[in-house]
Amino acid sequence: MNYSEITIGIVTFRSEKVIFECLDSIKKIKNIIILDNSFDKLLKKKIISKYPYIKIFLSKKNLGYGVANNILIKKSKTQFVFILSPDVILEKNCEKNLLSSIKKLKKNFAILSPDDQKMTYGYFDRTKFPRKKLLKCDFVVGSALLINKNKMKKIGLFDENIFLYYEDRDLCKRIKFANENVYVDKTSKINHFGAKSTNIGSEFEKCRNWHLMWSSVYFDRKYLFFLIFYAKNLFLLLSLTLRIIFYTVLLDKKKAMYKQFRLSGAYNSLIGNSSWYRPKI
């Protein structure tokens, strides 16, 4: 087992401000493929100029996180694919320790995630097992996932109905249902700066709020009992409506607007519409 058996896959969208710091932090793995969802020819030229060994593909339309990562996973020629967000930085020895953990687990895992103190790992309390280096958990955040393609053959990849958010939870849920394992490697460290992988300002916030709610309702529809699903999400619609009224009365136009986007995302998902909203850029 060596570094050549791992491919790093990165999906970008208006990510020029962060992607180079991410790539600079990758010291050992040279199989790197990028799919840019904003068809940025200049970014491609800059990346290839600095890192000639990287393969970068441009998409003429914004495919979303899940679809784009599925393309990268399918394009990779290795058993293991390390999915990274462009605003993630690998700390010293992250790759070395991940490789060591793959060997320790004897490749018997579906997902292995490096550790970030800001991450949550489902219902796992990290303080109960402070000395354990490999922690089995319910789910991990999708900003850094080392995926074992051999295990994914029976599970499937990211749900392509989801444009943004909850792809990671959905995948981990299906892994758990398939009686496969998700681990966190506490010896491998990353820094994820969060919500900095794109630089389109308020348009990103509108898109983020819309898809956060759409994906939340979609996720609930997949995994909650019928009556619980409708009770929970009808209450969500009422709550968002009241918040819009509240912020409108307070003349806080920005918060009222973002709540409107949340309401639209939740409503569209509840009535069965696809995740159609895209940022206007």
Identify the residue ranges that each predicted region occupies.
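Active-site donor/metal-binding and catalytic loop motifs
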Residues: V184-F204, S215-S216
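Short aromatic/hydrophobic "clamp" motif used to bind/position activated sugar donors
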Residues: V81
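A conserved acidic beta->alpha catalytic loop
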Residues: S25, I34-K44
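Short, well-formed alpha-helical segments that are part of the catalytic scaffolds
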Residues: I10-K28
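A short, conserved alpha-helix in the catalytic core of glycosyltransferases
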Residues: F139, A144-I147, K151-G156, N161-K189
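Glycine-rich, basic loop-to-helix element that forms the pyrophosphate-binding segment
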Residues: S59-S76
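Non-catalytic, C-terminal membrane-associated alpha-helical segments of glycosyltransferases
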Residues: C207-S215, F226-I281
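Conserved donor NDP-sugar-binding/catalytic core segment of glycosyltransferases
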Residues: I89-Y123
